[in-house]
């Protein structure tokens, strides 16, 4: 009986495990694969109607299909699934997590470390540009199907797209926890529809399956030497969203993402592209919109509805990714602090950042109004995508060689292969900068300027403050000689340096002539890892005479809740009772000058960013009625 019971229990646990695995797989399909899953809407259309000069004939179609297939296999299956997904930072992925790893890998090489940081900032900047382009091009391409269903309403495509997109941004502050549960099933339905349409098309012209032979891709370059590299600028559209596999790894883990790719997403994409190719072999005129023309007439409107839902889900994933990237960048010190609102009581990762949301919305609206069609936007899309892919390869190269210590004989050939393919895709998109691709470059340039100015400005600010800092041991010695009046309670002074006296403490002594019975010099340390366990959260050191030094460590995915963290600090004589604890903050006002370190115009820009950044009070969740803020002026 006991044996039977244990078998029943293990069987039940096995079913639960299988159910959880399927649930994770479906959820991953809904979040991770929305972008790459909607690429069939516009990729082949752009290849054959984008002015590349590719003929819609037997060799041209098979050559392009072979290029798309082997690009998916090399870039997504081999590079991202088999290699990049292994470069996790304690389970987290994405540009900032990878930059943190690369910083750690190059710690012994200062110049190389600086280069890795620059690459990471450029990659993050391009991602924000991509976060504007993806919603615009995806929703436009879906709504364009309405023009095929009803004659004479093409002029409604832009207004309908704008309504859908603006509504999407307006609901962000309320979160997507409830409707988010539908994303997975909807996207699974979408991929099944892609596969079914593809099978329908292939059955009409099975010879299209010859494109599985890579010789057709090689032959295309031989026959079309003039446009061979240029056409990669359109082929790369089939790879848009590949970066999401890595960026969203922290939500689902490597295995569910990999399984979803090989079991459902890759087969559905390949079938659909080949189905569209089969249609083009039969009817070259279908190149104007091969995706929708592949569907039977009765299925067109339902397909437009399903495509619109899929593109909205893809857009939601990119917007959420921008919120997550911003939080990581804030924690790592690359972006000014902003108001972060949690939209779910259960999921810590579901956040809303108003400044990012409204900036993205304005960018998306301007893109839709300015470009008016998905085809016109395709040029801008490729630059952002290929730039991000190339930078990811550069960062992971440092990690593989310097952190993982892979043997160069094994790592270098693989990395050279990645860099060669990424470099070709990027080079193919460089000429598009003059055709609309300037947008992500300009947007990325502006964002890089802001992030680099903030990072450098904060470094100079700390240096200037440190120049006149009083060493803590000297201050404590003077206190012993001339003891000031002490009052009951704990005073917590936030400071970037733990070995010097904070300006706020000196100002408090100067104006109030008193000290609290307990004085805590608190330094918050941002780690290059996503989370710091509670037992590693704090370091405490007693200096005597009621002075303590406390270091709090937070990862870039942690919530920097200082009062909650201080409750974990256990040391005799240290008391953080809320109503007996007062937090003293220093508020710096920056004055741009001609001092070395930063040009005056960048100094003014930094001063503007600092003035509008969220202060320590909200960022560290300090109690409003227990905070005293003291100001100081600093020249940079």
UniProtKB/Swiss-Prot annotation:
Entry's localization field: Cell inner membrane
Keyword set, alphabetical order: Cell inner membrane, Cell membrane, Ion transport, Membrane, Potassium, Potassium transport, Symport, Transmembrane, Transmembrane helix, Transport
Segments passing through the bilayer: 22-42, 64-84, 115-135, 150-170, 182-202, 220-240, 261-281, 293-313, 351-371, 383-403, 408-428, 433-453
InterPro entries, per database record: K+_transporter (IPR003855), K_trans_C (IPR053952), K_trans_N (IPR053951), Kup (IPR023051)
Broad class of the protein's primary localization: membrane
Reactions catalysed: K(+)(in) + H(+)(in) = K(+)(out) + H(+)(out)
A GO-annotated cellular component: plasma membrane
Membrane topology: Multi-pass membrane protein
Disulfide bonds listed in the record: none
Keyword Lipoprotein: no
Record function comment: Transport of potassium into the cell. Likely operates as a K(+):H(+) symporter.
Family: Belongs to the HAK/KUP transporter (TC 2.A.72) family.
The protein's name: Probable potassium transport system protein Kup
Organism, as annotated: Pseudomonas putida (strain ATCC 47054 / DSM 6125 / CFBP 8728 / NCIMB 11950 / KT2440)
Name of the gene: kup
């Amino acid at each position: 009986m006991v044996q039977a019971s244990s078998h029943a229990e293990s069987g039940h646990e096995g079913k639960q495990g299988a159910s959880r695995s399927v649930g994770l797989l479906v959820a991953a399909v809904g979040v991770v694969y929305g972008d790459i899953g909607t690429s069939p809407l516009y990729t082949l259309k752009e290849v054959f109607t984008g002015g590349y000069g590719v003929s819609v004939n037997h060799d041209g179609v098979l050559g392009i299909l072979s290029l798309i297939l082997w690009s998916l296999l090399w870039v997504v299956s081999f590079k991202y699934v088999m290699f990049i997904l292994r470069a996790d930072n304690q389970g987290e992925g994405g540009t900032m997590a990878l930059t943190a790893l690369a910083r750690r890998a190059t710690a012994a090489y200062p110049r190389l470390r600086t280069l890795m940081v620059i690459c990471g900032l450029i990659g993050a900047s391009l991602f924000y540009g991509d976060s504007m382009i993806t919603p615009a091009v995806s929703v436009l391409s879906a709504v364009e199907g309405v023009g095929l269903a009803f004659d004479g309403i093409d002029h409604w495509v832009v207004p309908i797209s704008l309504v859908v997109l603006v509504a999407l941004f307006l609901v962000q502050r309320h979160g997507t926890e409830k409707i988010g549960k539908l994303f997975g099933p909807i996207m699974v339905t979408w991929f099944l529809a892609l596969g079914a349409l593809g099978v329908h098309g292939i059955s009409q012209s099975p010879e299209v399956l010859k494109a599985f032979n890579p010789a057709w891709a090689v032959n295309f370059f031989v026959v079309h030497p003039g446009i061979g590299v240029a056409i990669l600028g359109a082929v790369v559209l089939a790879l848009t969203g590949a970066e999401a596999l890595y960026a969203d790894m922290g939500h689902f883990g490597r295995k569910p993402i990999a399984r979803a790719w090989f079991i459902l997403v890759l087969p559905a994409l390949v079938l659909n592209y080949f189905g569209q190719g089969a249609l083009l072999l039969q009817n070259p005129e279908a190149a104007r919109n091969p995706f929708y023309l592949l569907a039977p007439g009765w299925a067109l409107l339902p397909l437009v509805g399903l495509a619109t839902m899929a593109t909205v889900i893809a857009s939601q994933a990119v917007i959420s990714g921008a919120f997550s990237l911003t939080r990581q960048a804030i924690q790592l010190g690359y972006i000014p602090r902003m108001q972060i609102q949690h939209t779910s009581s259960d999921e810590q990762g579901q956040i809303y950042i108003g400044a990012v949301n409204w900036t993205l919305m304005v960018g998306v609206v301007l893109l839709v109004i300015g470009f008016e069609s998905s085809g016109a936007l395709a040029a801008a899309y490729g630059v952002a995508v290929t730039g991000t892919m190339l930078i990811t390869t550069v960062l992971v190269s440092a990690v593989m060689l310097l952190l993982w210590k892979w043997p160069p004989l094994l790592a270098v050939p693989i990395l050279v292969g990645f860099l060669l393919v990424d470099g070709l895709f990027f080079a193919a998109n460089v000429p598009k900068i003059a055709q609309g691709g300037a947008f992500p470059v300009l947007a990325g340039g502006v964002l890089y300027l802001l992030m680099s100015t903030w990072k450098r400005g904060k470094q100079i600010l700390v240096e200037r403050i440190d120049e006149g800092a009083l060493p803590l041991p000297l201050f404590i010695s003077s206190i012993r000689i001339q003891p000031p009046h002490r009052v009951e309670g704990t005073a917590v002074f936030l400071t970037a340096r733990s070995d010097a006296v904070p300006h706020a403490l000196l100002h408090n002594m100067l104006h109030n002539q008193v000290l609290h019975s307990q004085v805590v010099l608190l330094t918050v340390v941002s780690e290059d890892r996503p989370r710091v366990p509670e037992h590693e959260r704090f370091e405490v050191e007693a200096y005597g005479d009621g002075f303590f030094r406390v270091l709090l460590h937070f990862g870039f995915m942690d919530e920097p809740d200082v009062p909650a963290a201080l409750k974990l600090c256990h040391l005799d004589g240290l008391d953080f009772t809320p109503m007996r604890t007062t937090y003293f903050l220093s508020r710096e006002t920056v004055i741009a000058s001609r001092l070395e370190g930063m040009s005056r115009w960048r100094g003014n820009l930094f001063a503007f960013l600092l003035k509008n950044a969220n202060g320590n009070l909200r960022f560290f969740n300090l109690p409003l009625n227990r905070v005293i803020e003291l100001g100081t002026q600093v020249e940079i």
